[in-house]
Amino acid sequence: NPEKARIRQEFARGNVGRDKLLEAEAASYHAPGTCTFYGTANSNQMVMEMVGLHLPGAAFVQPGEELRTALTREATKKAAAISIAGDYTPAGEMIDERSIVNAVVGLMATGGSTNLVLHLASFAASAGIVLTPQDMAEISAVTPLLCRIYPNSAADVNHFHAAGGMGFLIRELIKGGLVHADARTINGTLADQAMEPFIGADGEIEWREPPETSGDLEILRPVD
């Protein structure tokens, strides 16, 4: 954020000490266990939703929130339900070329970390799929940038989540014909990922449609 950037500059000039720098850094994070910067870690969180290995809307819910605790419980139930003792859904059978394309489209549409060029190639290789930088360049050329998240703007991942987050993004990418809506996920298909979680009256997780309009067009815009 601007204040953290200012303090870093002042520290580099020798005008403030390490204590002031640490105070500014700590104040930039909303809760323990979070990273507001849309770098490698959060880009991978986005990818996990795009390939359907996350529960819908789970990527950017903060630690310590009641919703995060409920999502953790629900994820445990889902992991058990798709294990060998239930509706067996191994990742090796679920992830295919459509999943990888969806991941790359998500990366380009959100302006994610360039480190994902390496991460996604490795991820694809583990599924027996060859993904090259040229493949990513060709996908990038036809994928609109729908998000502006720090460091591409002053807004962090929490602002992105509040503006509509992954549910809104996935729905827009499907609407634009930019992703494979039929790619398999732990929830069914990618089309089933275009949802946002909330806690129902019984304290359990429920899902609803994402908002029809972006909460902030400077951060997250529709595909058309």
Predicted regions and their residues:
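Catalytic or ion-coupling anion/metal-binding cores of large enzyme and transporter domains
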Residues: N1-D224
